[in-house]
């Protein structure tokens, strides 16, 4: 999308032109660096511990082989699982995955994967705005985020993978948060009282993260085994 819009605006000068495109002031070369090379490098570095395993270390120079291996692992899960979920449950943030809940190092600890209850729903409102803005106001950046989110979600009900989990929502939710970020930026540019929704949304989002942080970070929990009930707002999260 970035390349197409730059080419449309500047033709042969698209590589170093700063005008046009979904993000004004950024050249195509800069976009390739910050949106391409840097994320790929950080992704590669996230495997650093695996490069140094004593047994079966990951080959650092075969990243495509990592993806192939992970796909095989994903496709190998075919039996029902207590934490499996469906795509529409991800949208509603109705299901969670527990990775840990037991006593570790003398304290009760837990690690649960769940979406931020506030931002997940705020993102859906922003998705509707992004679609409207993309069509009505030619906000191609917002429209691109919205269409990409929808495209990533549509493939799951059509997928042949029988067992699905909420972590499959990580990529679509990234574009959902992109819609939210652009929506908040649009609110902040207003000159009326609605602009103050932007800091309010940010404050609530951060507050919600802080509230759930102990149960997603393996922090020591007070209250023993029943401690997790403090964060279980929905029965389906248990």
Model-derived regions, located:
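Hydrophobic transmembrane alpha-helices of multi-pass, membrane-embedded glycosylation machinery
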Residues: 1-8, 171-174
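Transmembrane helical bundles and short interhelical boundary loops of multi-pass, membrane-embedded
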Residues: 7, 11-35, 39, 48-53, ...
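Membrane-interface helix-loop-helix junctions at transmembrane boundaries of multi-pass membrane enzymes
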Residues: 11-30, 126-147
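Luminal/periplasmic active-site loops of membrane-embedded glycosylation enzymes
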Residues: 56-104, 229-238
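Hydrophobic, aromatic-rich transmembrane alpha-helices
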Residues: 103-139
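Membrane-interface catalytic loops of GT-C/OST-like multi-pass glycosylation enzymes that act
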Residues: 112-115, 157-170, 215-219
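Membrane-interfacial loop-to-transmembrane alpha-helix junctions, especially the N-terminal start
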Residues: 120, 136-148, 193-201
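Hydrophobic/aromatic-rich transmembrane helices and adjacent perimembrane loops
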Residues: 163-185
């Amino acid at each position: 999308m970035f390349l197409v819009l730059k080419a449309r605006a500047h033709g042969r000068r698209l590589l170093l032109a700063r005008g046009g495109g979904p993000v004004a002031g950024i050249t195509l070369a800069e976009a390739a660096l910050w949106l391409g090379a840097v994320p790929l490098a950080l992704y590669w570095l996230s495997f650093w511990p695996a490069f140094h395993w004593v047994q079966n270390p990951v080959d650092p120079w075969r990243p495509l082989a990592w993806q192939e291996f992970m796909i095989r692992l994903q496709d190998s899960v075919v039996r029902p699982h207590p934490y499996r979920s469906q795509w529409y449950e991800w949208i509603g943030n109705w299901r969670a995955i527990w990775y840990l809940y037991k006593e570790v190092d003398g304290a009760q600890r837990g690690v649960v994967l769940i979406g931020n209850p506030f931002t997940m729903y705020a993102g859906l409102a922003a998705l509707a705005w992004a679609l409207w803005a993309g069509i009505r106001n030619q906000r191609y950046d917002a429209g691109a985020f919205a269409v990409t989110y929808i495209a990533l979600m549509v493939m799951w009900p059509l997928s042949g993978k029988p067992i699905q989990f909420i972590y499959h929502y990580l990529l679509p939710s990234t574009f959902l948060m992109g819609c939210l970020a652009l929506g908040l930026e649009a609110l902040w540019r207003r000159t009326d009282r609605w602009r103050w929704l932007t800091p309010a949304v940010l404050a609530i989002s951060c507050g919600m993260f802080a509230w759930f942080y102990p149960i997603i970070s393996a922090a020591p929990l007070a209250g023993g085994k029943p401690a997790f009930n403090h964060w279980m707002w929905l029965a389906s999260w248990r």
